[in-house]
Amino acid sequence: MKKKDDEMEIVEINTEFIKLDQLLKWANFTASGVESKMFILNGEVKVNGEIETRRGKKIYDGYIVEFNGEKIKVKASTE
């Protein structure tokens, strides 16, 4: 689920972490897991300012993910 913050979108997750490829789908950046995998393997995704090529990278609360000119911040729900 995306929410708007002053500077970037906030994406809420209901678990401690989410894998990078799953996050791209959850945030509606990609239409499928295959598409997510290709963008990640091509070095088109940054996590906390660093290019990330591991699709299974665990993304935790507070991480910032950049893709295609957009930034999102992950927020783990406490509910």
Stretches with model-predicted labels:
Residues 54-79:
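C-terminal structural segments of small proteins and small subunits
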Residues 1-2, 17, 23, 35, ...:
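Generic N-terminal leader/processing signal
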Residues 4-18:
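A detector for short, charged/polar N-terminal pre-domain segments
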Residues 19-61:
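A basic, amphipathic helix-loop patch mediating RNA/tRNA/ribosome contacts
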Residues 1-3, 78-79:
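Short acidic DE-rich linear segments
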